[in-house]
């Protein structure tokens, strides 16, 4: 009898839990973790499983039937495409960012290996490519990373001399430093857009969480 009652209580509790699956750009890691914890103070039964990675990779996962409630990418063009092809209900820009050139503190030369995200899948890499196409630097060889946080890791670990990352990522630097923040005229607007998957079974809770995020900047 006790076992039956315990199982009943577990099922009852689970039925009232609010579990969302959120696919988000790697650069959103700290932002999302912080705001999920804040939201839990309002909604104690709220739970989120984060799937972080390159925006292009996350987009493909959704297109291939991946299980997701909310998708939050660093390239609005990806989100517009998802909306037009009916993978998401709508999309809305709620954050913006800038690009920065960083270097390992041990680097003394202006020449070296420059890490950027793979522009085919990583918006930060695509924005970086726009900057490089306009500035035409001749002093770098290139290495491509799976997401912008991998770029940061390459530079921090000395596996690359320089890297181009989002300005918000530079808060995590320990062994590296900012060389410059690029003028926004050198690249397309860096806009983070969020939306609810058409396939989501938790749309009401997803909308509530997105409304909460709208009032939250990077800080």
Predicted regions mapped to residue ranges:
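Polybasic, low-complexity, intrinsically disordered segments
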Residues: 13, 41-47
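Central regulatory/effector-binding core of bacterial HTH transcription factors
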Residues: 45-62
């Amino acid at each position: 009898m006790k076992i039956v009652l315990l199982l009943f209580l577990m099922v009852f509790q689970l039925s009232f839990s609010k579990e969302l699956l959120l696919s988000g750009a790697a650069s959103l890691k700290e932002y999302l973790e912080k705001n999920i914890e804040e939201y839990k103070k309002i909604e104690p039964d709220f739970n989120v499983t984060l799937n972080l990675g390159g925006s292009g990779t996350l987009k493909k996962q959704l297109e291939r039937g991946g299980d997701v409630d909310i998708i939050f990418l660093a390239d609005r063009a990806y989100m517009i495409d998802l909306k037009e092809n009916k993978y998401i209900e709508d999309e809305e820009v709620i954050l913006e960012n800038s690009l920065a050139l960083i270097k390992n503190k041990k680097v003394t030369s202006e020449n070296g290996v420059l890490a950027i995200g793979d522009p085919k899948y990583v918006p930060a890499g695509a924005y970086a490519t726009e900057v490089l196409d306009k500035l035409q630097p001749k002093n770098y060889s290139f290495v491509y990373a799976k997401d912008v946080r991998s770029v940061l890791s390459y530079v921090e670990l000395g596996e690359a001399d320089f890297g181009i990352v989002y300005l918000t990522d530079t808060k995590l630097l320990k062994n590296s430093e900012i060389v410059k923040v690029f003028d926004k005229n050198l690249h397309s607007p860096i806009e983070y857009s969020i939306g609810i998957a058409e396939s989501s079974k938790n749309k009401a809770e997803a909308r509530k969480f997105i409304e909460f995020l709208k009032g939250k900047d990077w800080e």
